[in-house]
Every structure is written in structure tokens, then in C-alpha cells.
């Protein structure tokens, strides 16, 4: 009974919020807010505009470090495992890989935007 009541309340609240958001008018409508690009690029301009290669290298570096950090996020729950030494070894390996790759990027000047 509690599950059905919770489900009913959640569906009702969700439907109510969607209806309110749909029927209320948007107050601040201007071109900067309605544009899907908020990063300074002109969406109606040329699609063949060249980008700096440094931009892509920094973006890929960010994605790799972000992925490694996402792999470290479940570590607090992994401390409850039976084989604690394997978990600690894996965590230490990931952290050292992160530190070594950061040092490599730093020495190769991959983190500097201007040359």
C-alpha cells in the first residue's frame, strides 16, 4: 500500500509541475537565452570555422582526468569488500596513473593555453 501511495504522489507531483511549467509564460525571452549555444559561438555563422588544436588537447585531457576521477568515486563503498588489499592496490594504481599523467602533461606544456 505504501508503494502505491508513494508512486501515486510522485506521479501527481510530477504531472503538476510539468503542467505549471508548460502553462506559465516565460518572462525573460531574448535572443541570448533562446540560443542553444551559450559559449560565444554564432550558431548562424560558418560551420567550417577552424579551432585551435590546443583547445582539443585540453578538452581530451579534461575528459581523461574526469574519467579517472569517476572511476575513483565508488571507493568509499569499495572499502567494505572482503579483499581490501586488492581494492587499495587498484585505488593506488589509479591515483598514481592520474599523478603520472598530470606530471607528463605538465612537462610537455599541454596545460598551457598560450604558446
Swiss-Prot record:
The UniProt entry's GO biological process terms, in alphabetical order, are: mitochondrial electron transport, NADH to ubiquinone
Segments spanning the bilayer are 3-23, 55-75, 84-104
Kindly list the GO CC terms recorded for this protein.
Answer: mitochondrial inner membrane; NADH dehydrogenase complex
Q: Which Gene3D superfamilies match?
A: NADH:ubiquinone/plastoquinone oxidoreductase, chain 3 (1.20.58.1610)
Which compartments does it reside in?
A: Mitochondrion inner membrane
Protein's UniProt keywords contain Translocase: yes
Q: How does it sit in the membrane?
A: Multi-pass membrane protein
The UniProt catalytic activity note for this protein reads: a ubiquinone + NADH + 5 H(+)(in) = a ubiquinol + NAD(+) + 4 H(+)(out)
Named from the GO MF annotations, one term is: NADH dehydrogenase (ubiquinone) activity
Q: What class of enzyme is it?
A: translocase
Record-listed E.C. numbers: 7.1.1.2
Write out the entry's keywords from A to Z: Electron transport, Membrane, Mitochondrion, Mitochondrion inner membrane, NAD, Respiratory chain, Translocase, Transmembrane, Transmembrane helix, Transport, Ubiquinone
Recorded hits in InterPro entries, A to Z, give: NADH_UbQ/plastoQ_OxRdtase_su3, NDAH_ubi_oxred_su3_sf
Under the subunit heading, UniProt states: Core subunit of respiratory chain NADH dehydrogenase (Complex I) which is composed of 45 different subunits. Interacts with TMEM186. Interacts with TMEM242.
Known function: Core subunit of the mitochondrial membrane respiratory chain NADH dehydrogenase (Complex I) which catalyzes electron transfer from NADH through the respiratory chain, using ubiquinone as an electron acceptor. Essential for the catalytic activity of complex I.
> What protein family does this chain belong to?
Belongs to the complex I subunit 3 family.
Listed name of the protein: NADH-ubiquinone oxidoreductase chain 3
Amino acid at each position: 500500500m505504501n508503494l502505491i501511495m508513494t508512486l501515486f504522489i510522485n506521479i501527481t507531483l510530477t504531472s503538476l509541475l510539468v503542467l505549471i511549467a508548460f502553462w506559465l509564460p516565460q518572462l525573460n525571452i531574448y535572443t541570448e537565452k533562446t540560443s542553444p549555444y551559450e559559449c560565444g559561438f554564432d550558431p548562424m555563422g560558418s560551420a567550417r570555422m577552424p579551432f585551435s588544436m590546443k583547445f582539443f588537447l585540453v578538452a581530451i585531457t579534461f575528459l581523461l582526468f574526469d574519467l579517472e576521477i569517476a572511476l575513483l568515486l565508488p571507493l568509499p563503498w569499495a572499502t567494505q569488500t572482503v579483499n581490501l588489499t586488492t581494492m587499495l592496490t587498484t585505488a593506488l594504481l589509479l591515483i598514481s596513473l592520474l599523478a603520472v599523467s598530470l606530471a607528463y602533461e605538465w612537462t610537455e606544456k599541454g596545460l598551457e593555453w598560450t604558446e
